Amino acid sequence: MIQEQTMLNVADNSGARRVMCIKVLGGSHRRYAGVGDIIKITIKEAIPRGKVKKGDVLKPVVVRTNKGVRRPDGSVIRFDGNACVLLNNNSEQPIGTRIFGPVTRELRSEKFMKIISLAPEVL
C-alpha cells in the first residue's frame, strides 16, 4: 500500500535510487496504490550521470509492496520493500533498460509487457 509521502526504491537502471510518492493517480480522493498502479513521484536520491536527476517529477508503476498482493487462490505475495519502475511521462514505457528484482504477474497487461520481459523473475 503506497500513499502520499511514502519512500520507494527504484527497481531499474534509470539513475534514481530513492523516490517519494506525491500523488496516487486514479480518482479524486484515492488514498492507496498497490502493485500495478501508476503514481506520481519526485526523485529524492539519484546517481551522477543518470538518465534522471534529483527533483524530477515522473509517473512510475509500482512493482513491489510490503503489503503484498492477494491472489484468487488465497495466497499472498509480499516483499521486503516498496519498489517502482520509472516510466516516460508521455509514452508510459520504462526509462531504464534493465529491471532489478522480481515482479508480480499482476503487471501482465498490455501497458506493462515491456517490464515483464525485462524482469529477471516473474512471481
Curated annotation (Swiss-Prot):
One of its GO terms (cellular component) is cytosolic large ribosomal subunit. Keywords: Ribonucleoprotein, Ribosomal protein, RNA-binding, rRNA-binding. InterPro entries: Ribosomal_uL14 (IPR000218), Ribosomal_uL14_bac-type (IPR005745), Ribosomal_uL14_sf (IPR036853). GO terms for molecular function: large ribosomal subunit rRNA binding; structural constituent of ribosome. It comes from the Bacteria. Pfam families: Ribosomal_L14. SUPFAM superfamilies: Ribosomal protein L14. The keyword Chaperone does not apply. GO terms for biological process: translation. Part of the 50S ribosomal subunit. Forms a cluster with proteins L3 and L19. In the 70S ribosome, L14 and L19 interact and together make contacts with the 16S rRNA in bridges B5 and B8. Belongs to the universal ribosomal protein uL14 family. Binds to 23S rRNA. Forms part of two intersubunit bridges in the 70S ribosome. This is Large ribosomal subunit protein uL14. It comes from Escherichia coli O6:K15:H31 (strain 536 / UPEC).
